[in-house]
Amino acid sequence: MAALIHEARLFFIALQFFTRVPVPAWVGYTPEWMHASARHYPLVGAWVGGVAALVLWLAAQVWPLSVAVGLSMAATVWLTGGFHEDGLADTCDGLGGSVSRERALTIMKDSRLGSYGALGLVGVLGLKAVALYELTDFDGVQALIALVWAHAVSRAVPVALLRLLPYAGDAEHAKAKPMAQQVSDAGLAAALGWAALACAAAWGLGASAFTLACAALGVIALAAFCVRWYRQRLGGYTGDTLGAAQQLCELAAYLGWLAGVWFE
């Protein structure tokens, strides 16, 4: 029982870190718990995706699909405070030009939005909107399943990067020091377990094995790209690059899912 309560505490810590949702007072906080909470990132993603799916379904009863998709995306941005989108913009600004590692890290710490960051945000969010619109228009139920699945599985990717790459910045002055520490094998296994459970749930709800395979391959391909890109350019990861990886892999999930239902 104590172990289950502790895991619930870790989930709430992750939920509090990544969303605006208030958590019970008994949850508490320590840097060690914050670090260990990484195993539950996909579960937080499933919760966010569930909200997105609910908003999409409700909005589609009242407005055209394009408006419903926009409101669904806006709901997730509000719910998470644009946490991952901010990381995407900073990463695009830092790595968009041919600058040195040190210069890239300095640019990524700048709170101002540059041209590469703006282009990255518009490109990724625009493609997500188009993919979700086409998927919803093709099969609304598949779109709802895909939303929850993509939000969950894409959040397993930052956990993998925490395990596979070293921290590229100054760990002592990191905004979230626990994120500057490597995740254990057990933590990564737990996160991947949540991702596997998301796949099983999606299949049980009607997603085909072919569609899931297409979406999963998209996520894996983008995750592998991020690992290689971050290692070459920065020698590791930063908090911003983790957010960028989540956004890119979420987009890859939608595109893969759409390809799966389109060609099946």
From Swiss-Prot:
Enzyme Commission code(s) on record: 2.7.8.26
- Disulfide linkages recorded for this protein, renumbered to the chain, are none
Q: In which pathway does it act?
A: Cofactor biosynthesis; adenosylcobalamin biosynthesis; adenosylcobalamin from cob(II)yrinate a,c-diamide: step 7/7
List, alphabetically, the InterPro entries matched. CobS
Q: What is its main location?
A: membrane
Q: Which domain of life is it from?
A: Bacteria
Give compartment(s). Answer: Cell inner membrane
Enumerate the UniProt keywords alphabetically.
Answer: Cell inner membrane, Cell membrane, Cobalamin biosynthesis, Magnesium, Membrane, Transferase, Transmembrane, Transmembrane helix
A Gene Ontology biological process term: cobalamin biosynthetic process
Q: What cofactor does its activity depend on?
A: Mg(2+)
**GO cellular component terms, semicolon-separated:** plasma membrane
The membrane-topology field of this record reads: Multi-pass membrane protein
Q: What terms describe the molecular function in GO for this protein?
A: adenosylcobinamide-GDP ribazoletransferase activity; cobalamin 5'-phosphate synthase activity
The answer to keyword Repressor applying to this record is no
Per its record, the protein catalyses: alpha-ribazole + adenosylcob(III)inamide-GDP = adenosylcob(III)alamin + GMP + H(+); alpha-ribazole 5'-phosphate + adenosylcob(III)inamide-GDP = adenosylcob(III)alamin 5'-phosphate + GMP + H(+)
Query: Transmembrane stretches, by residue range?
Result: 10-30, 43-63, 113-133, 141-161, 183-203, 205-225, 243-263
State the function annotated in the UniProt record. Joins adenosylcobinamide-GDP and alpha-ribazole to generate adenosylcobalamin (Ado-cobalamin). Also synthesizes adenosylcobalamin 5'-phosphate from adenosylcobinamide-GDP and alpha-ribazole 5'-phosphate.
The cross-references to HAMAP family, in alphabetical order and at most eight, read:
CobS (MF_00719)
Record-given protein name: Adenosylcobinamide-GDP ribazoletransferase
- Annotated source species: Leptothrix cholodnii (strain ATCC 51168 / LMG 8142 / SP-6)
Species classification? Bacteria, Pseudomonadati, Pseudomonadota, Betaproteobacteria, Burkholderiales
